[in-house]
């Protein structure tokens, strides 16, 4: 769920929408997956810590790669991950970095999230890579962004050098979250 539809950021609205989503999925064995910014994560941290369902945060929490691990709000995301209260997807590097094609400035963020709790990190492609760079009318079709998923996948060993760690990120953690196996 997008906690910031149209780029509007209102903590009260985000909190209410989150609670509505939780009510819908509670008791079904489902999780809530969010697209949000670090500022919203920071503001709602206490509420997120108390969710009765698993939380998945997309796109590195929408951190800005060029600002690194000390940017405002990143500590709140690390705290949620460290406490086992959120999974974070290492997905959509092209959303958080402008340094294509390898997005090297995303590496410190990925490494910090993995160090915080390797059992709460997932990897994803964000395929088919929708373009969310601006508002469009409901009649306009968003073009897809060209992203080399294979090349991004090849960054994972730099983010997680240990094969057992990569297995957690790619196999064990998704299996636990989605109930595979």
Descriptions of predicted regions:
Residues 53-54, 121:
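The start of beta-strands in P-loop NTPase/AAA+ ATPase cores
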Residues 1-39, 46-49, 82, 87-95, ...:
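Active-site gating/metal-coordination segments in enzymes
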Residues 70-181:
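H/E-rich (His + Asp/Glu) clusters that bind or coordinate divalent metals
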Residues 59-68, 117:
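Short, basic, helix/turn surface patches
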Residues 10-15, 38-53, 66-79, 100-111:
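Distinct, well-ordered alpha-helical segments
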Residues 1, 54-60:
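Short hydrophobic/aromatic-enriched beta-strand-loop microsegments
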Residues 38-41, 61-65, 94-96, 176:
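Short, catalytically relevant binding-site loops at active-site mouths
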């Amino acid at each position: 769920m997008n906690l910031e539809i149209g780029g509007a950021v209102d903590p009260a609205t985000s909190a209410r929408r989150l609670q509505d989503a939780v009510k819908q999925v509670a008791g079904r064995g489902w999780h809530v997956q969010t697209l949000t910014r670090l500022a919203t994560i920071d503001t709602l941290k206490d509420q997120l810590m108390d969710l009765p369902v698993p939380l998945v945060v997309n796109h590195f929490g929408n951190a800005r790669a060029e600002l690194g691990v000390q940017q405002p709000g990143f500590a709140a995301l690390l705290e949620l991950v460290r406490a086992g209260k959120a999974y974070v997807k290492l997905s959509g590097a092209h959303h958080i970095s402008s340094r294509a094609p390898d997005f090297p400035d995303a590496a410190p963020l990925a490494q910090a999230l993995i160090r915080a709790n390797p059992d709460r990190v997932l990897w994803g492609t964000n395929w088919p890579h929708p373009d969310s760079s601006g508002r469009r009318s409901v009649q306009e079709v968003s073009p897809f962004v060209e992203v080399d998923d294979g090349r991004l996948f090849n960054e994972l060993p730099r983010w997680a050098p240990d094969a057992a760690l990569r297995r957690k990120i790619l196999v064990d953690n998704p299996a636990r979250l989605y109930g595979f196996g």
